[in-house]
């Protein structure tokens, strides 16, 4: 396994936050509705991990270090783990496992439908994020995994619908997402290695 320390570091960093939040909830420091806080934090954690995952390829192009790509799939699977925890926390703390309330929630809060669509797409991507699926799907695998940008759009819409009034934090994540999308445009992507390659030449001339 390449970059084992890097991979272990990513594992610890991703695993520690849900455990820390659970500890905070158990310690009664999350306010009067700790369950709702957990749901929100896990949802935001999912979005942040998705953005970090999408940043791995541009970072590899910019730096030339293969370690970014080495943890990309790991980060993607952690993103899926977070969204599963987000959904589980919603079912336990918001619905109270009362499935009869789900229809009421869907009518009152249609952003839940948007979130559910994002979850289903992430499920497909997680299930096919292995070498067997890559071999079976061939060139279609890359096309399928471009759905991650649809997931990003759904995640941002889901968050926008929830926050509504205070858009400052949402605007930060949306801007990062937009930048990552621009960096994946083929002409822009092709220019990144050239920009890096020009740096030593410029330094030599100076």
From Swiss-Prot:
Cell location: Cell inner membrane
Main subcellular localisation: membrane
Recorded family membership: Belongs to the MsrQ family.
Job description of the protein: Part of the MsrPQ system that repairs oxidized periplasmic proteins containing methionine sulfoxide residues (Met-O), using respiratory chain electrons. Thus protects these proteins from oxidative-stress damage caused by reactive species of oxygen and chlorine generated by the host defense mechanisms. MsrPQ is essential for the maintenance of envelope integrity under bleach stress, rescuing a wide series of structurally unrelated periplasmic proteins from methionine oxidation.
Annotated GO biological process: protein repair
Full protein name: Protein-methionine-sulfoxide reductase heme-binding subunit MsrQ
Membrane topology: Multi-pass membrane protein
Complexes and interactors: Heterodimer of a catalytic subunit (MsrP) and a heme-binding subunit (MsrQ).
Organism: Pseudomonas fluorescens (strain SBW25)
Cofactor(s) the record lists: FMN; heme b
Pfam families: Ferric_reduct
Signal peptide location: none
Keyword Flavoprotein: yes
GO cellular component, one term: plasma membrane
GO molecular function: electron transfer activity; FMN binding; heme binding; metal ion binding; oxidoreductase activity, acting on diphenols and related substances as donors
InterPro entries recorded: Fe3_Rdtase_TM_dom (IPR013130), MsrQ-like (IPR022837)
Membrane spanning stretches: 10-30, 42-62, 75-95, 110-130, 147-167, 169-189
Cofactor note: Binds 1 FMN per subunit.
Keywords: Cell inner membrane, Cell membrane, Electron transport, Flavoprotein, FMN, Heme, Iron, Membrane, Metal-binding, Transmembrane, Transmembrane helix, Transport
């Amino acid at each position: 396994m390449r970059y084992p320390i890097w991979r272990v570091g990513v594992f610890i960093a991703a695993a520690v936050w849900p455990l820390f939040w659970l500890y905070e909830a158990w310690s009664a420091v999350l306010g009067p509705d700790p369950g709702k806080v957990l749901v929100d934090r896990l949802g935001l954690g999912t979005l942040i991990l998705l953005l970090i995952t999408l940043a791995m390829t541009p970072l590899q192009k910019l730096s030339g270090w293969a370690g970014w790509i080495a943890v990309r799939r790991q980060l993607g699977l952690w993103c899926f783990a977070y969204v599963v925890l987000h959904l589980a926390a919603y079912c336990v703390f918001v619905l109270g496992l009362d499935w009869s309330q789900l229809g009421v929630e869907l009518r009152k809060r249609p952003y839940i439908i948007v979130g559910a669509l994002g979850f289903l797409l992430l499920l497909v991507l997680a299930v096919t994020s292995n070498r067997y699926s890559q071999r079976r799907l061939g060139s279609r695998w890359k096309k399928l995994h471009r759905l991650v940008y649809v997931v990003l759009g759904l995640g941002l819409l889901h968050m926008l619908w929830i926050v509504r009034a205070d858009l400052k934090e949402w605007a930060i994540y949306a801007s990062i997402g937009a930048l990552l999308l621009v960096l994946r445009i083929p002409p822009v992507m092709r220019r990144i290695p050239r920009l890096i390659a020009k740096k030593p030449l410029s330094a030599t001339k100076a």
